[in-house]
């Protein structure tokens, strides 16, 4: 059975969690299965992200959409932005960023 969720959900020390994916049919750069990837697709965080640049990536992608920040995808986010977000939550305790 095919699963679109190829990379396990990342969980941080404070309980924050988020899906981060990088493969040919996700919003990543380069848009291929093999890494390294400079930008990745995040999605469905357990609470609104803290990093302003991560929030901005969603706002830029879905201009005018004021929907729930926990029920959406964050496209083409730089690896460094995800690293900062996870550090703001005490660091990764489960999972890892895609390569």
Where are these regions (language model features)?
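Short secondary-structure subsegments characteristic of cysteine-rich extracellular domains
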Residues: 31-54
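Low-complexity intrinsically disordered segments
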Residues: 49-99
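Amphipathic, interaction-prone secondary-structure segments
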Residues: 2-38
């Amino acid at each position: 059975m095919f699963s679109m969720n190829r990379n396990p959900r990342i969980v941080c020390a404070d309980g924050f969690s988020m899906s981060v994916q990088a493969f040919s049919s996700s919003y990543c750069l380069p848009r291929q299965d093999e890494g390294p990837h400079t930008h990745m697709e995040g999605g469905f965080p357990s609470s609104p992200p803290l990093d302003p640049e991560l929030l901005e990536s969603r706002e830029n992608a879905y201009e005018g959409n004021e929907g729930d920040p926990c029920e959406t995808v964050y496209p083409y986010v730089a690896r460094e932005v995800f690293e900062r977000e996870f550090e703001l939550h005490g660091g990764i305790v489960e999972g890892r960023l895609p390569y």
